[in-house]
Amino acid sequence: MYKEPFQPTYEYALECDKHDELKDFQTEFYKKEGTIYLDGNSLGLLSKRAEKSLLTLLDSWKEYGIDGWTEGEHPWFFLSEKLGELTAPLIGALPEESIVTGSTTTNIHQVIATFYEPKGIRTKILADELTFPSDIYALQSQIRLKGLDPDEHLVRVKSRDGRTLSEDDIIQAMTDDIALILLPSVLYRSGQILDMKRLTAEAHERGIHIGFDLCHSIGSIPHHFKEWDVDFAIWCNYKYLNAGPGGVAGLYVNKKHFNRLPGLSGWFSSRKDKQFDMEHTLTAADHAGAYQIGTPHILSTAPLIGSLEIFKDAGIERLREKSLHITRYMLNLIDHELKDFGFAIGNPLEDEKRGGHIYLEHAEAARICKALKANGVIPDFRAPNGVRLAPVALYNTYEEVWQSVMILKKIMKDEEYKQFENKREVVA
């Protein structure tokens, strides 16, 4: 599929683009002329299909008013379940195990409220010190709601190098006092993929429920939840899945737990045929829809309709194949062109451990990111010293990767970054 072996030339980049089986999808996206967008791991670009589905849902409001809940091309009342079914193949789940609902953080609160049942000596939640802050805030909050002290009952696995986690260390931390585990599938800084299959098996061997935050993996790597028997998962849809800023998130619950009442119940937790009976006793849905809380945010959900059509056409296996190749290409090019400028590669080099973005460490990272933006390359800064670059399989080209590395080389060689302050903006 892709030209080998690596060559650091512009011509090689063009050859790779020529052989790219996914190249036709680039025209599906709005790409600003003169800009190389390498921040799809924070916010994916708008596609024409996502735009169309948003406008379609707006038109249904205009056309049907209240009847839009049951009329039109995409009736709102069933939309969350429909999109959950379309998302299920991306995580290797059954259609009824996936639901599009809430936000990442509200969904964390939901699954923790549902699965965290401290009793006896099992009172602690296991997480890690490198996870995204919102996960920790939610876990601390849920522990306090149980009348417990987060300082004592939230265990965070330490990193040996400040970048990655050892699965052996995580397993060693699965002690008899652990009631629940929440871990990232892919670390948001270093892009390390955790071995979800192994960790799930080890947790279950010890009688512990385990779930994963998929924000940096869904739409980028394949998942096999049915095979792995993961208990629950949550994710956002606005990164690799291109659902737009504030796009509605997703939630997975293993079907073996469908008899478990949601920790946070609401009107849309109800079975559809019972919802408008207006009873004060909840008859929960017999699928992942039970873990919805409130009325779905229809207009924030709409772009995902078109976006998931693209993923169905492209196929997650093909997307992963290109992602691995284009990130490997970028790593090779960085090593070839930037080795004299003080950069350290912070993400794993092994294919099976590397997610969809590159993580460079540099003491001047914040001002380097500003210089890149000034030169038309959109990166992502992560404190304290990280530059994240995400060549997304659906819409980035090898030519863009080559150009961005050459721009970065010029910035470093000419010390252009020194004209900027070495501190982050309000939104990094």
UniProtKB/Swiss-Prot annotation:
Signal peptide: none annotated. Its cofactor is pyridoxal 5'-phosphate. Its EC number is 3.7.1.3. It catalyses: L-kynurenine + H2O = anthranilate + L-alanine + H(+); 3-hydroxy-L-kynurenine + H2O = 3-hydroxyanthranilate + L-alanine + H(+). SUPFAM superfamilies: PLP-dependent transferases. Pfam families: KYNU_C. Pyridoxal 5'-phosphate binds at T104, T105, F132, P133, S134, D135, D213, H216, Y238, W267, T295. Pathway: Amino-acid degradation; L-kynurenine degradation; L-alanine and anthranilate from L-kynurenine: step 1/1; Cofactor biosynthesis; NAD(+) biosynthesis; quinolinate from L-kynurenine: step 2/3. The keyword Hydrolase applies. GO terms for biological process: anthranilate metabolic process; L-kynurenine catabolic process; L-tryptophan catabolic process to kynurenine; NAD biosynthetic process; quinolinate biosynthetic process. The modification N6-(pyridoxal phosphate)lysine is found at K239. It is an enzyme of class 3 (hydrolase). GO terms for molecular function: kynureninase activity; pyridoxal phosphate binding. Belongs to the kynureninase family. Homodimer. This is Kynureninase. It comes from Bacillus thuringiensis subsp. konkukian (strain 97-27).
